[in-house]
Amino acid sequence: GVRAKAVVMATGGWVNRHVVRDLPPAFTNAYAQFVHAPFLVANVALTNWQFLYKLGITAAIWDRGEGNFGYTCNIRIPMQVGGYRPPLDPSKPTVLSFYTPFFYPGEDIRAQAARGRAELLQTSFREYERQILGQMVKLFGASGFDPQRDVAGLILNRWGHAYSVPYPGFYGGSHGQAPRDIIRQ
């Protein structure tokens, strides 16, 4: 083990409560009350975005109904450094980012998080690629999107514990002690 007067753990609380042996019980209990939801960010490298320009958009949102992937996407603004301001030009390459939460209405929040993490990690790259490109054809095919011509690459960022889900009672806690306030001490 490591011995020190003070330790800074630069990991998530879901890890800290299992790794730090002498963590005060109040912290361990507070960390146990957090629920972390998974999230997928898919970055699609495009050779151009003329198909979006024809629609007059740089972003889209849609119903996450049956057969749909994700619920929103947007073009990443080119990086600006110092005085350098690259143009947002539809004939130039860009990245289109898709944001995908995992939720299952009617299920307990912890069960949703666990099920979402399992789906996130068990789904193959090829399956996500199929779903994403299929969604793009559905949304943008009529305006000229062609995956063979317009897609240069795809990167998946799988976040198993992306964000804390504030369930009912989370902010007030029990007996006025909210888990987030205990952790901040």
Residue ranges and their predicted role:
Residues 2-64:
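Glycine-rich loop(s) and the adjacent beta-strand/alpha-helix scaffold that form part
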Residues 45, 51-185:
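Conserved flavin/dinucleotide-binding core of flavoenzymes
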